[in-house]
Amino acid sequence: MQPTSVGSSGGGDDGGGRGGGGGLSRSGLSRIRSAPATWLEALLEEDEEESLKPNLGLTDLLTGNSNDLPTSRGSFEFPIPVEQGLYQQGGFHRQNSTPADFLSGSDGFIQSFGIQANYDYLSGNIDVSPGSKRSREMEALFSSPEFTSQMKGEQSSGQVPTGVSSMSDMNMENLMEDSVAFRVRAKRGCATHPRSIAERVRRTRISDRIRKLQELVPNMDKQTNTADMLEEAVEYVKVLQRQIQELTEEQKRCTCIPKEEQ
C-alpha cells in the first residue's frame, strides 16, 4: 500500500489522481492507497475554514441571526470535497469525519459559533443518573404541601427538623402502607383474609352444632356426611313428636282417683 501525500493546494490532488489513473490503465484493477497517520490532521486543518462555512450559515439560520441566506433548495448546496487521489476510478466521495480528540479540544471553535466552551451538552429533560426515579420521588415529596406544613409546624414549635433521614423514614412508611404483601400460602386454618376468617368461623360453628346433634341423636353414624346426619336427626325428631302425642292422649284418657285427705 502506497501512502498518498495531501497538500494544501489542488495540484497535489490532481497529481495523485493521474498516478492512480496510470496504475488503473496498466493493471485494470482499482487500487486503494492508504493514508498516513498525519493525513487526517492535515485534512482537518485544510478543510477547517471551507467545510465549516455552510454549518455556520445553518447555525445562524436556526438561531434566527442570519437574514442573507437563500431560501430555495436549489440555490444553496453543501460542497462535498472529492479526493481524487484515493478513489479515482471507483467514483467514491470522501466524507470528512471529526475525531474525538478534535471535539475534546475544540473550545475555541465552539466559541466562534457563539456557544460557551463549558456548555453542558446534556439536556435538562434527560436524566441519566441511575437513581433518577428515586430523586424525582424525593423532589415531589419535598415540594408537597404536607411536607411544607410539617416543616412550618416544626419550626413554630421550636423543634429541630431531622432533615433527609426523617423524610426518608416517612417515605418508607408511606411505601409500606401502599405496598401489597406477597401472596404467601398460609397454613391450613391460619388464613388472615377477612373473608377467609368469616368462612372459617362459619365452618367451625357448623361443626359444633353437628357435634351436639350427634350427642342428642342416638346411634347416629358419625362417618356419614352432613346431609345424612341431618336426615337422621329429622327422623329422630319426628319419632319424639309421635311419642309426645301418644303420651298426651293417654294422659287425657286416664282418670285418677284423688287421695282422701286424712
Curated annotation (Swiss-Prot):
Gene Ontology cellular-component annotations: nucleus
Cross-referenced Pfam families: HLH
Keywords: DNA-binding, Nucleus, Transcription, Transcription regulation
Domain bHLH as annotated: residue spans: 190-240
Protein localization: Nucleus
Biased composition regions of type Gly residues, renumbered to the chain: 8-25
PROSITE patterns: BHLH
Primary location group: nucleus
GO biological process: one example: regulation of photoperiodism, flowering
Region (Disordered): 1-29
Record-linked InterPro entries: bHLH95_bHLH (IPR045239), bHLH_dom (IPR011598), HLH_DNA-bd_sf (IPR036638), IND-like (IPR045843)
GO molecular function: cis-regulatory region sequence-specific DNA binding; DNA-binding transcription factor activity; protein dimerization activity
Tissue expression from the record: Expressed in flowers.
SMART domains documented for this protein: HLH
SUPFAM superfamilies linked to this entry: HLH, helix-loop-helix DNA-binding domain
Keyword Transcription regulation: yes
Keyword Transcription set for record: yes
Oligomer status and interactors: Homodimer.
Name of this chain's protein: Transcription factor bHLH81
UniProt organism field: Arabidopsis thaliana
Gene: BHLH81
